């Protein structure tokens, strides 16, 4: 939304803040690359080039792990989550998927069978209630942040959903933005996994 369309005139009175204090430079770069040159909107009717931003923090480069099958991805995720839980508070770890279907069909049963304490953040569940690692959709994690984020099931069938992939245009760009936002929920580490055919947004 351009602010002047809402009756708010800020031209000549606004400043651009180019420093990211939440996530690392390595995660910021990966997430920005997902946007593939898409310009940002500075809310004043002008375009804002995202490459001008930078983070003060540095850390590990995001990892993208591709697997042949869901079973192989599942084994990796359980190992990775258990490893993270050895040094991190479980509440600071979030497994994120594009859809509720993925979470309910694949990842909730996976964590239950592995005996990993977890909390499913649906639309009615506060993120601060209960212990265990968090599970949420990409939409649900908007506005939240976690030390460690695992973006799971980033496959061609789900990211973007088939109808949106076929439509292209603004809908496809919105999916890029959604993946960008989900990735930048991570403060320290970002791990992206997929199985079968990877999402075209990862290329």
Segments (PLM) and residue ranges:
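Conserved helicase motor core of SF1/SF2 NTP-dependent helicases
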Residues: 1-179, 189-198
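A conserved SF2-helicase RecA2
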Residues: 200-203
């Amino acid at each position: 939304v351009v602010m002047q369309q809402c009756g708010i005139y800020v031209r000549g009175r606004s400043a651009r803040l180019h420093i990211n204090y939440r996530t690392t430079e390595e995660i910021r770069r990966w997430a920005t690359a997902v946007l593939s040159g898409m310009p940002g909107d500075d809310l004043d009717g002008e375009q804002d080039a995202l490459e001008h931003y930078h983070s003060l923090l540095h850390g590990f480069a995001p990892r993208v792990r591709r697997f042949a099958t869901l079973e192989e991805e599942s084994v990796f995720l359980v190992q990775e989550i258990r490893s993270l839980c050895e040094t991190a508070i479980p509440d600071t770890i979030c497994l994120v998927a594009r859809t509720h279907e993925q979470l309910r069909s694949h990842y909730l049963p996976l964590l239950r069978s592995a005996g990993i304490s977890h909390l499913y953040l649906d639309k009615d569940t506060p993120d601060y209630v209960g212990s265990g690692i968090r599970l949420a959709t990409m939409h649900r994690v908007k506005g939240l942040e976690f030390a460690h984020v695992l973006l799971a099931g980033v496959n061609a069938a789900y990211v973007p959903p088939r109808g949106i992939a076929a439509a292209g245009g603004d809908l496809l760009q919105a999916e890029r933005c959604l993946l960008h936002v989900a990735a930048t929920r991570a403060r320290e580490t970002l791990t992206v996994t997929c199985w079968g055919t990877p999402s075209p947004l990862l290329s």
